[in-house]
Protein backbone atom coordinates (compact mmCIF):
# COMPACT_ATOMS: atom_id res chain seq x y z
CA UNK A 1 0.00 0.00 0.00
CA UNK A 2 2.87 2.41 0.87
CA UNK A 3 6.26 1.91 -0.73
CA UNK A 4 9.42 4.00 -0.29
CA UNK A 5 12.43 3.07 -2.40
CA UNK A 6 15.72 4.87 -1.68
CA UNK A 7 13.96 8.18 -0.90
CA UNK A 8 16.36 11.03 -0.26
CA UNK A 9 15.22 14.60 0.29
CA UNK A 10 17.09 17.86 0.84
CA UNK A 11 15.20 21.00 1.86
CA UNK A 12 16.19 24.06 -0.20
CA UNK A 13 19.59 25.39 0.85
CA UNK A 14 20.23 22.32 3.07
CA UNK A 15 23.64 20.68 2.85
CA UNK A 16 22.46 17.40 4.43
CA UNK A 17 19.37 15.37 3.57
CA UNK A 18 16.53 15.16 6.08
CA UNK A 19 15.63 11.78 4.54
CA UNK A 20 18.55 9.65 3.42
CA UNK A 21 17.89 6.55 1.28
CA UNK A 22 14.69 5.58 3.12
CA UNK A 23 13.27 2.27 1.92
CA UNK A 24 10.24 0.55 3.45
CA UNK A 25 6.94 -1.12 2.65
CA UNK A 26 3.77 -0.73 4.69
CA UNK A 27 1.00 -3.18 3.85
CA UNK A 28 -2.70 -2.36 3.81
CA UNK A 29 -4.12 -2.62 7.32
CA UNK A 30 -0.70 -2.43 8.96
CA UNK A 31 -0.46 0.09 11.80
CA UNK A 32 2.75 2.03 12.22
CA UNK A 33 3.93 4.77 14.53
CA UNK A 34 6.25 7.46 13.19
CA UNK A 35 8.42 8.61 16.11
CA UNK A 36 11.68 10.46 16.57
CA UNK A 37 13.16 13.63 18.02
CA UNK A 38 12.30 17.07 16.74
CA UNK A 39 13.91 17.67 13.35
CA UNK A 40 14.44 13.99 12.57
CA UNK A 41 12.25 14.00 9.44
CA UNK A 42 8.93 12.60 10.72
CA UNK A 43 6.79 15.33 9.17
CA UNK A 44 8.88 15.33 5.99
CA UNK A 45 8.35 11.57 5.68
CA UNK A 46 4.58 12.03 6.00
CA UNK A 47 4.56 14.93 3.55
CA UNK A 48 6.11 12.63 0.95
CA UNK A 49 2.92 10.55 1.13
CA UNK A 50 0.66 13.36 -0.07
CA UNK A 51 3.12 15.08 -2.41
CA UNK A 52 3.67 18.18 -0.28
CA UNK A 53 7.33 17.14 -0.51
CA UNK A 54 8.60 18.13 -3.02
CA UNK A 55 5.71 20.11 -4.62
CA UNK A 56 5.14 22.64 -1.84
CA UNK A 57 8.56 22.76 -0.19
CA UNK A 58 10.84 22.50 -3.23
CA UNK A 59 14.31 21.16 -2.57
CA UNK A 60 15.90 18.07 -4.08
CA UNK A 61 14.02 14.77 -4.14
CA UNK A 62 15.29 11.37 -5.29
CA UNK A 63 13.86 7.88 -5.10
CA UNK A 64 10.34 6.58 -5.47
CA UNK A 65 7.19 6.76 -3.37
CA UNK A 66 3.98 4.86 -4.09
CA UNK A 67 0.75 5.15 -2.12
CA UNK A 68 -2.04 2.79 -3.19
CA UNK A 69 -0.28 2.53 -6.55
CA UNK A 70 -0.12 6.32 -6.99
CA UNK A 71 3.07 8.35 -7.29
CA UNK A 72 2.73 11.53 -5.16
CA UNK A 73 5.73 13.10 -6.90
CA UNK A 74 4.02 12.84 -10.29
CA UNK A 75 0.63 13.98 -8.97
CA UNK A 76 -0.16 17.28 -7.34
CA UNK A 77 -1.08 17.17 -3.61
CA UNK A 78 -4.70 17.90 -4.56
CA UNK A 79 -4.70 14.67 -6.55
CA UNK A 80 -3.50 12.75 -3.49
CA UNK A 81 -5.96 14.29 -1.02
CA UNK A 82 -8.61 11.65 -1.70
CA UNK A 83 -6.11 8.94 -0.73
CA UNK A 84 -3.87 10.44 1.97
CA UNK A 85 -4.64 12.38 5.13
CA UNK A 86 -2.94 12.70 8.49
CA UNK A 87 -3.04 14.63 11.76
CA UNK A 88 0.15 16.10 13.19
CA UNK A 89 1.05 15.96 16.89
CA UNK A 90 -0.48 19.41 17.50
CA UNK A 91 -3.97 19.09 15.97
CA UNK A 92 -4.97 22.47 17.43
CA UNK A 93 -2.59 24.12 14.97
CA UNK A 94 -3.99 22.11 12.07
CA UNK A 95 -7.76 22.07 12.42
CA UNK A 96 -9.85 25.03 11.29
CA UNK A 97 -13.22 24.15 12.88
CA UNK A 98 -14.38 22.78 16.23
CA UNK A 99 -16.03 19.43 15.43
CA UNK A 100 -14.91 16.30 13.61
CA UNK A 101 -17.96 16.53 11.34
CA UNK A 102 -17.21 20.13 10.36
CA UNK A 103 -13.54 19.28 9.78
CA UNK A 104 -14.51 16.43 7.46
CA UNK A 105 -16.93 18.72 5.61
CA UNK A 106 -14.24 21.39 5.22
CA UNK A 107 -11.90 18.94 3.48
CA UNK A 108 -14.63 17.73 1.13
CA UNK A 109 -15.79 21.27 0.35
CA UNK A 110 -12.24 22.00 -0.78
CA UNK A 111 -12.53 19.06 -3.17
CA UNK A 112 -15.78 20.48 -4.59
CA UNK A 113 -18.08 17.63 -3.50
CA UNK A 114 -21.84 18.13 -3.42
CA UNK A 115 -23.62 18.66 -0.08
CA UNK A 116 -25.53 15.39 -0.58
CA UNK A 117 -22.38 13.34 -1.16
CA UNK A 118 -20.57 15.08 1.72
CA UNK A 119 -23.42 14.29 4.15
CA UNK A 120 -23.48 10.63 3.04
CA UNK A 121 -19.70 10.20 3.42
CA UNK A 122 -19.57 11.97 6.78
CA UNK A 123 -22.33 9.80 8.23
CA UNK A 124 -20.69 6.61 6.92
CA UNK A 125 -17.28 7.44 8.38
CA UNK A 126 -18.63 8.64 11.72
CA UNK A 127 -20.62 5.41 12.05
CA UNK A 128 -17.73 3.16 10.94
CA UNK A 129 -15.37 4.73 13.47
CA UNK A 130 -18.01 5.12 16.22
CA UNK A 131 -17.14 8.80 16.63
CA UNK A 132 -20.49 10.45 15.85
CA UNK A 133 -20.45 11.97 19.35
CA UNK A 134 -17.34 14.01 18.52
Pin down the residues of each PLM region.
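A short, flexible loop at the N-terminus of ABC-type nucleotide-binding domains that lies
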Residues: 1-4, 9-21, 53-58, 74-76, ...
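Conserved hydrophobic segment flanking the Walker A/P-loop of ABC-type ATPase nucleotide-binding domains
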Residues: 26-28, 79
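Short, conserved post-Walker A segment of ABC-type ATPase nucleotide-binding domains
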Residues: 32, 43-56
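The feature captures the beta-strand-to-loop junction immediately N-terminal to the Walker
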Residues: 35-37
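Short helical segment in ABC ATPase nucleotide-binding domains corresponding to the A-loop/adjacent helical element
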Residues: 50, 85, 92, 98-109, ...
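ABC ATPase NBD Q-loop/coupling interface
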Residues: 51, 64-79, 114
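Conserved ABC ATPase "signature" region
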Residues: 69, 116-134
Amino acid sequence: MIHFDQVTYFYPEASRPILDRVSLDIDEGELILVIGPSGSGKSTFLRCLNGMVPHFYGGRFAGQVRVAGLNPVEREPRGMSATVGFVFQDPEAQFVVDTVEDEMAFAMENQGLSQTLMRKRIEEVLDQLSIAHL
